[in-house]
Amino acid sequence: MQKATYYDSSAIYSGYPYQSANGFSYDANQIQYPRTSHVESEYHRPACSLQSPGGSVALQKREMAAENCDRTTAVQAVQSKVHPESNQPQVPVSAPPPPPQSPGAISQTTSNGSNQPTAKNSSPTSASRGKQIFPWMKESRQATKQKSTSNTSSVESCPGDKSPPGSAASKRARTAYTSAQLVELEKEFHFNRYLCRPRRVEMANLLNLTERQIKIWFQNRRMKYKKDQKGAGMMPSPGGQSPRSPVGPGSTGAGGGGYLNSMHSLVNSVPFESQSPTSYNKPHQNAYGMATSYPPPLSSSHNNCPPTQKRYAGTDSATPEYDAHPLQGNGSYGTHMQGSPVYVGGGYIDSVPNSGSSVFGLTHLPHPPSANMDYNGAITMGNSQHHGVCDPTPTYTDLTSHYSQGRIQEAPKLTHL
């Protein structure tokens, strides 16, 4: 009703003789205003269209643009008389204005009604602008989250083997090799620890595996091999001997079972760094092939003798009991029996000037001439090697009854070592 009243009042005021023909206004507050044709051209002026999107914006800027809006009100009044039918369809569509408090408020209401198409045109722009800001930003954030999650999942899935055990989604399935595949892989690793690519392709086709699986298996197998080698290298050698010693760990089986292996004898004779003058080979029962060489003593300057006798029990009837025999020769006792255990016994080689062998005085010097070989070992040792400081009566039990002359022929086989 108020809207109709406003429009009726404008029609009443427009009934005064000063109308649009002269360009004067009906209101004392207004000055002259343009013609109707000019009003038609200025129908969409931007002066009040800035305030058209909402009534709240119009109220906020009412004081600033009062003159422009009043002028637009007068123009609308003239247009309402000239074109009454064009404004009537716009009345119910116009936004509800705030309650009138002054003629400025009335002019604001009329301006809202007159500039409704502009409001319609500008409101979609603001709505589209809002859609461009908030939903677009929200969608981009979701897309960013999706991209970040996809990137992280791809990064986690790329290492494969190195993925943490907790990430179940990106954890690579463990490859289960069959026994046939493992046999072929181990066989190939035995011959060649590093595979070339053609061979890897061939094995991949043969075992129905991928090249990557075979490559990774060989990498893991090489690491395991290195660990095994490192663990074996840290342990002492089986014989406890110098690396240049020709006597192997399996040589104890050829000698008598009562003879200690070289590692144990080394522990028992730590102060002594020499070989025993005797070595035994057991080709058959109780037959000992003894290859002993005793160069004549150069001097009798022996420092000490072992404090106790070392008893080494032979097999069956052969139980030799003898002490260590310090010799000051070249340190080569010629104990070169093939496959016989070496007794690292109690000779003192501290004062040996010309010993070119290792610290153990092992069998690296040339074999003494066969003229020094005496198979009657007890007599030779008793006559030429025992001195008054040591025990003068070493006992050799039943050794001279089983010497085999033919076993000494095996001795020169290892002299080149």
From Swiss-Prot:
Residues of the DNA-binding region: 170-229
Entry GO MF terms: DNA-binding transcription factor activity, RNA polymerase II-specific; RNA polymerase II cis-regulatory region sequence-specific DNA binding
Polar residues bias (residue ranges): 104-129, 143-156
Keyword Transmembrane in annotation: no
Gene3D superfamilies: Homeodomain-like
InterPro entries from the UniProt entry: DUF4074, HD, HD_metazoa, Homeobox_Antennapedia_CS, Homeobox_CS, Homeodomain-like_sf
Pfam family, one: Homeodomain
Region (Disordered): 70-174, 229-256, 311-334
Keywords: Developmental protein, DNA-binding, Homeobox, Nucleus, Transcription, Transcription regulation
Entry superkingdom: Eukaryota
Motif (Antp-type hexapeptide): 133-138
Principal location class: nucleus
Location in the cell: Nucleus
Reported function: Sequence-specific transcription factor which is part of a developmental regulatory system that provides cells with specific positional identities on the anterior-posterior axis.
Family per similarity comment: Belongs to the Antp homeobox family.
Protein name in the entry: Homeobox protein Hox-A3a
Species the sequence originates in: Takifugu rubripes (Japanese pufferfish)
